[in-house]
């Protein structure tokens, strides 16, 4: 998996380990199976080679690494492309590198974002990367049909510190709470299980209903400050 050193990725890794899985995580931060920059082709190749040399096969690939978030006003050409390399190119290339080694019943789960369908100002690099990985999901599902199931998850507001919010922060969510990493980890485990054997090419939004909630200025206490 990618991006397993902290946050959602760390929780996913821990939950797989509880199920007896051997987790090979790559992250820029130290303390994981492989430390390196996902934007570099040679890093991806070295990571894949290490995994295959040591274990010989891959059951699940979880693409979770966080792309850079910068907007049109301050994001450089290099930074924008860096975000795409981490968020889209790396997931594609790892799937390509591991393609000959996926086990029977293997699954890929890509972590996208609810920002793949909605936006805030000055978030272009992140939003485009997340939109890209959502599209990559259904493309890979068709290309790898019959061998590997491929799905994606689009989290909404997930507090990676497991903070329990109250008041407006919680109530604005239709489920009346902010999400936590277990909400995502549980779905990843399900999508990798035989229970999800008839699901591929899908994107599942886990956002407490926020993207389904219509918001208008002056309605239900909402206001837009100009």
Named regions from a protein language model:
Residues 64-69, 209:
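Conserved NAD(P)H cofactor-binding loop of Rossmann-fold oxidoreductase domains
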Residues 71-84, 169:
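Substrate-binding pocket helix/loop in short-chain dehydrogenase/reductase
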Residues 95, 129, 137:
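Active-site helix of classical SDR
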Residues 200-226:
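Short C-terminal tail/terminal secondary-structure segment
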């Amino acid at each position: 998996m990618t991006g397993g050193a902290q946050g959602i990725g760390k929780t996913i890794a821990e939950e797989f380990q509880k199920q007896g899985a051997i987790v090979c995580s790559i992250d820029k931060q130290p303390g994981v199976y492989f430390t390196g920059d996902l934007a570099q082709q040679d890093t991806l190749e070295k990571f894949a080679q290490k995994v295959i040399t040591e274990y010989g096969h891959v059951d699940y690939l979880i693409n979770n690494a966080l792309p850079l978030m910068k907007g049109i006003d301050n994001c450089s050409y290099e930074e924008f492309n860096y975000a795409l390399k981490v968020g889209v190119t790396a997931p594609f290339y790892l799937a390509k590198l591991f393609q000959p080694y996926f086990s029977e019943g293997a699954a890929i789960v890509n972590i996208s974002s609810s920002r793949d369908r909605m936006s805030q100002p000055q978030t272009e690099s992140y939003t485009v990367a997340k939109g890209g990985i959502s599209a990559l999901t259904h493309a890979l599902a068709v290309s790898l049909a019959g061998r590997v199931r491929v799905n994606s998850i689009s989290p909404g507001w997930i507090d990676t510190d497991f903070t329990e919010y109250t008041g407006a922060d919680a109530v604005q969510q239709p489920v009346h709470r902010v999400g936590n990493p277990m909400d995502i980890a549980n779905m990843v485990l399900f999508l990798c299980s035989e229970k999800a054997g008839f699901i591929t090419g899908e994107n599942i939004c886990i956002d407490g209903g926020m993207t389904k909630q219509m918001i208008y200025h002056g309605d239900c206490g909402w206001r837009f400050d100009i």
